[in-house]
From Swiss-Prot:
Residues the entry annotates as binding substrate: 296, 500, 660
Pfam families noted in UniProt: 3HCDH (PF00725), 3HCDH_N (PF02737), ECH_1 (PF00378)
Pathway linked to the protein: Lipid metabolism; fatty acid beta-oxidation
Protein name as annotated: Fatty acid oxidation complex subunit alpha
Span list, region 3-hydroxyacyl-CoA dehydrogenase: 311-716
Entries under Gene3D superfamilies matching the protein: 1.10.1040.50, 2-enoyl-CoA Hydratase, Chain A, domain 1, NAD(P)-binding Rossmann-like Domain
Chain's role: Involved in the aerobic and anaerobic degradation of long-chain fatty acids via beta-oxidation cycle. Catalyzes the formation of 3-oxoacyl-CoA from enoyl-CoA via L-3-hydroxyacyl-CoA. It can also use D-3-hydroxyacyl-CoA and cis-3-enoyl-CoA as substrate.
This protein's UniProt keywords: Fatty acid metabolism, Isomerase, Lipid degradation, Lipid metabolism, Lyase, Multifunctional enzyme, NAD, Oxidoreductase
Superkingdom of the organism of origin: Bacteria
InterPro entries membership: 3-OHacyl-CoA_DH_CS (IPR006180), 3-OHacyl-CoA_DH_NAD-bd (IPR006176), 3HC_DH_C (IPR006108), 6-PGluconate_DH-like_C_sf (IPR008927), ClpP/crotonase-like_dom_sf (IPR029045), Enoyl-CoA_hydra/iso (IPR001753), FA_oxidation_alpha_subunit (IPR050136), FadB (IPR012799)
Region (Enoyl-CoA hydratase/isomerase): 1-189
GO cellular component annotations of the record: fatty acid beta-oxidation multienzyme complex
C-alpha cells in the first residue's frame, strides 16, 4: 500500500501502474475538506515513488464522486474574501498537482462524477466511463460557478461552445453524450471499466497515445480564432441571459469567466475563476440556492427515516378518476407501485386513463421512455367501477370532489372494503382532516395527502396529520409519496393546511390593492419580473380557477375570521360572480386563447377591467415596492405563524413547501431564508408601516422578540 487514509487508498498494480481509490465512509464519495487533504497527501506519496509509471483513479462505490460536500459551503462562504481565496487556491493546488504528475493519468468513471468529481477527472489525461456514468458541473444551480478549475479545463477538453452549455445549464450528461463531445475517451461495460482504463495507460506508457500533447492543450490558451470567439461568446451571453434572467447571476458569470480565461494559460485562467467564484459565493442568491439544496436533503432525510417505521406499500388505489386521479395513478404506476383507479362512472375512468396515457406518450416522444415501458406502466393501472378491486390495497388515496359530505361518505364506504391495516388518505386542499376522520371507524389509519396540480409536474405533497393519525400511518404515507418521486412535508391539520393557509393572505393583499384601484396586470408584472414569482397573483388565480379560489377563500375566512374574514366584495368575488373562472372557461382576469402548440395564451381583456372599475372605481398606480410589500407581508407573517403554532415543523420544511408547492422564487430561498437575508428587524419595521391595513399585516410577539435580539430563523 502506497498510501491509506479513511477516504483514499493507493496501491501499486502490475506494470507499475498505481491505483488511487476513493473510498470514503458512507454510501458515496464527496469532496469534503478531509478528502481534499487526503488527496493532496496521496499525490505527494505517489510523486515520491519513482517506480510508478502511470496512475488510474477509481471509486469503490457505485458512484465516482458526487461533488463537493455542500454542507460545508455556507460556513465557508461566510468567511472573509482572503480566507475564501486561500481555500480556493489550496484546493486548486491539489488539482494542479494531479494534472502535473510526471506520467500519464486516467480516470475510471462509474455513476456520478459531478462538480468536484468532474473537475477531478478533467485534471487527468484520459477519461474512461462505464455505461452508468453521468458527468457534469451543476454549480450554477447553487448560484456559483465551478471552483476547482472546471471553467478552465472543460473548454480546453470539449471546446468553448460545449463547455458553455454544460456549465451554464448545470445538467448531468450521460456517458454516450460525453463521448460525443470528447469529455470521455471511451464508454465501456461496467465490468470492463478498470481494465479498459489500465490498458489505455499501458498504451500511453508505450507511447501509442500522446498523453503529453493532451495535457499541454489543457495548460494553454484556447485555440479559437478571434472572430469566432467573439461570435461564440456574444451568442452565448444572449441565450444564457434569456434563460437565467437578472435574478440568477451565476450562468452569466460563467460565460464571462470562460471568455476572459480563453486567451490565458492555466495559472492566469484559474485566477480569473477564483475571483468570480468568491464574488458569487458571497451573494444572497448563492446562500438561498445552497440553502434550498440543504433543505431538500433535510426533508428527504426525514422521509428516509420515516421509511423505517412505514408499512410497505406494494399495492395502491385512488378513488376518483379524472385528471387528478389519472395523474396520481400515473405517478404511482410509473414509479413501480401498481394502482387501482376506482370511480363510479366509466367516462371518468376513461378520462383518467387517457391522462396517464397522454403523460406517458409525451415521455416516449421526448425519448425519456419507450413504448414497452409505457405499456408496462399502463398495465400497472387497473380501472374499476367496483370497490372489490381495492381489497388488497395497502394505501387508498381518496380523490373525489372537494365536498366534505361526499368525501365523508366515500371514506366511510371504502373502510368496509379494505383490510384492517390498510391506510386511507384524503387528497384534499381545504377540508379539515379531523372533520373527515369523524366518519372513520379507524381514524388512526387515516391522514391527508394533498397533491398539487398538475401531479406529474409539482414536486410537493403535503401529508396532513390529524389528531388521531398514528405515526405508522404518517410514516407509511410519507414513504409512499417518496416512492412516487415526490417531496413530502408533514404538516398538522388546520384550515388550508400549510400551503393554502399561507397563499390566501397573499391573495388578500392582492385583493386589497385592487380594491384601491390597482391594475392586476401591472401587479402581476411586478411580482413576476421584480420579485420573481413564475406567475403573478391574477395569473395564478386564473390557472388555479376562480371558482376554486372563491371556495378556498371562504374556507380560510371561516377558519381565521379575525385576519382573513371579509367585509365586502373583493376582486375574486367579482370574477366568480361574472362566471369568469380563469383558464378553465377561457376568461378570468385575463382572456385565453390557444396558441400554435395547443397551450393557453393570455391577453389583457377590457371586460375584466370594466368589471373591476364598476366595483372599485378608477385605476390607480402603485409603486413596485408598495405592491411587493402589500402582497408579501401577509404571506410571510402567516408562514411565521404556522411555524410558531407547530403547523409546520421547521423553517427548512416551510421553505421547501413554498418553493416546491407554490413556486416561491428559488433565488430568494423561501420565506425564512428571505427574512434572514432581509433581517428580521428590518421586516418588522416594514410590516409596521402597513399594520393599519389589518390583522394580516401585524407581526407576532415572537417575531418582535427575535428582531429585538437580532436573531435569525436559520443557524449559520
Amino acid at each position: 500500500m502506497i498510501y491509506q487514509s479513511p477516504t483514499i487508498q493507493v496501491e501499486l498494480l502490475e506494470d507499475n501502474i498505481a491505483k488511487l481509490c476513493f473510498n470514503a465512509p458512507g454510501s458515496v464519495n464527496k469532496f469534503d475538506r478531509e478528502t481534499l487533504t487526503s488527496l493532496d497527501a496521496a499525490l505527494d506519496s505517489i510523486k515520491q515513488d519513482s517506480n510508478i509509471k502511470a496512475l488510474v483513479l477509481t471509486s469503490s462505490k457505485d458512484t465516482f464522486i458526487v461533488g463537493a460536500d455542500i454542507t460545508e459551503f455556507l460556513g465557508l462562504f461566510a468567511q472573509d474574501d482572503a480566507v475564501l481565496l486561500s481555500w480556493v487556491e489550496q484546493a486548486n493546488a491539489v488539482f494542479n498537482k494531479l494534472e502535473d504528475l510526471p506520467f500519464p493519468t486516467a480516470s475510471a468513471i462509474k455513476g456520478f462524477a459531478l462538480g468536484g468529481g468532474c473537475e477531478t477527472i478533467l485534471a487527468t489525461d484520459f477519461r474512461i466511463a462505464d455505461t452508468t456514468a453521468k458527468i457534469g458541473l451543476p454549480e450554477t444551480k447553487l448560484g456559483i460557478i465551478p471552483g476547482f478549475g472546471g471553467t478552465v479545463r472543460l473548454p480546453r477538453v470539449i471546446g468553448a461552445d460545449n463547455a458553455l452549455e454544460w456549465i451554464t445549464t448545470g445538467k448531468d450528461q450521460r456517458a454516450e453524450d460525453a463521448l460525443k463531445v470528447g469529455a470521455v475517451d471511451a464508454v465501456v461495460a461496467p465490468q470492463a471499466l478498470e481494465a479498459a482504463a489500465i490498458q489505455m495507460l499501458k498504451d500511453a506508457v508505450a507511447e501509442k497515445l500522446d498523453w503529453q500533447a493532451r495535457r499541454n492543450r489543457k495548460l494553454s490558451a484556447l485555440t479559437l480564432p478571434k472572430l469566432e470567439a467573439m461570435m461564440s461568446f456574444t451568442t452565448a451571453k444572449g441565450m444564457v441571459f434569456a434563460v437565467a434572467g437578472k435574478h440568477y447571476p451565476a450562468p452569466m458569470a460563467a460565460v464571462s469567466v470562460i471568455e476572459q480565461a480563453s486567451t490565458k494559460g492555466r495559472a492566469e485562467a484559474l485566477q480569473i475563476e477564483h475571483q468570480a467564484f468568491i464574488k458569487l459565493a458571497k451573494t444572497d442568491v448563492a446562500k438561498a440556492l445552497i440553502g434550498i439544496f440543504l433543505n431538500d436533503q433535510f426533508v428527504k432525510g426525514k422521509a428516509k427515516k420515516a421509511g423505517k417505521l412505514a408499512k410497505e406499500v406494494n399495492n395502491a388505489a385512488v378513488l376518483g378518476a379524472g385528471i387528478m386521479g389519472g395523474g396520481i395513478a400515473y405517478q404511482s404506476a410509473s414509479k413501480g407501485t401498481p394502482i387501482v383507479m376506482k370511480d363510479i362512472a366509466q367516462p371518468a375512468l376513461d378520462l383518467g386513463l387517457n391522462e396517464a396515457a397522454k403523460l406517458l406518450s409525451a415521455q416516449v416522444a421526448r425519448g425519456r421512455s419507450t413504448p414497452e415501458k409505457m405499456a408496462k406502466v399502463l398495465n400497472n393501472i387497473t380501472p374499476s367501477l367496483d370497490y372489490a378491486a381495492i381489497k388488497h390495497s395497502d394505501v387508498v388515496v381518496e380523490a373525489v370532489v372537494e365536498h366534505p359530505k361526499i368525501k365523508a361518505q366515500v371514506l366511510a364506504e371504502v373502510e368496509g372494503y379494505v383490510s384492517e391495516d390498510a391506510i386511507i388518505a384524503s387528497n384534499t386542499s381545504t377540508i379539515s382532516i379531523n372533520l373527515l376522520a369523524k366518519s372513520m371507524k379507524k381514524p388512526e389509519r387515516f391522514c391527508g395527502m394533498h397533491f398539487f396540480n398538475p401531479v406529474h409536474k409539482m414536486p410537493l405533497v403535503e401529508i396532513i396529520r390529524g389528531e388521531h393519525s398514528s405515526e405508522e400511518t404518517i410514516a407509511s404515507v410519507v414513504a409512499y409519496a417518496s416512492k412516487m418521486g415526490k417531496t413530502p412535508i408533514v404538516v398538522n391539520d388546520c384550515p388550508g393546511f400549510f400551503v393554502n393557509r399561507v397563499l390566501f393572505p397573499y391573495f388578500a393583499g392582492f385583493n386589497g390593492l385592487l380594491a384601491e384601484g390597482g391594475d392586476f396586470a401591472a401587479i402581476d408584472k411586478v411580482m413576476e419580473k421584480q420579485f420573481g414569482w413564475p406567475m403573478g397573483p391574477a395569473y395564478l388565480l386564473d390557472v388555479v380557477g376562480l371558482d376554486t379560489g372563491h371556495h378556498a377563500q371562504a374556507v380560510m375566512a371561516e377558519g381565521f375570521p379575525d385576519r382573513m374574514g371579509k367585509s365586502g366584495t373583493d376582486a375574486i368575488d367579482v370574477m366568480f360572480e361574472n362566471k369568469r373562472l380563469g383558464q378553465k372557461n377561457g376568461k378570468g382576469f385575463y382572456v385565453y386563447s390557444v396558441d400554435s402548440r395547443g397551450k393557453p395564451k393570455k391577453d389583457v381583456d377590457p371586460t375584466s377591467y370594466g368589471l373591476l372599475k364598476d366595483a372599485f372605481g378608477e385605476l390607480k398606480a402603485f409603486e413596485a415596492d408598495d405592491i411587493i410589500a402589500r402582497t408579501m407581508i401577509p404571506m410571510i407573517i402567516e408562514t411565521v405563524r404556522c411555524l410558531e403554532e407547530g403547523i409546520v415543523a421547521s423553517p427548512a420544511e416551510a421553505d421547501m413547501g413554498l418553493v416546491y408547492g407554490l413556486g416561491f422564487p428559488p433565488f430568494r430561498g423561501g420565506v425564512f431564508r428571505y427574512l434572514d437575508t432581509m433581517g428580521v428587524a428590518n421586516f418588522v419595521a416594514l410590516a409596521d408601516k402597513y399594520a393599519h391595513l389589518g390583522g394580516l399585516y401585524q407581526v407576532t410577539d415572537a417575531m418582535r422578540t427575535l428582531a429585538a435580539n437580532n436573531g435569525s430563523y436559520y443557524q449559520a
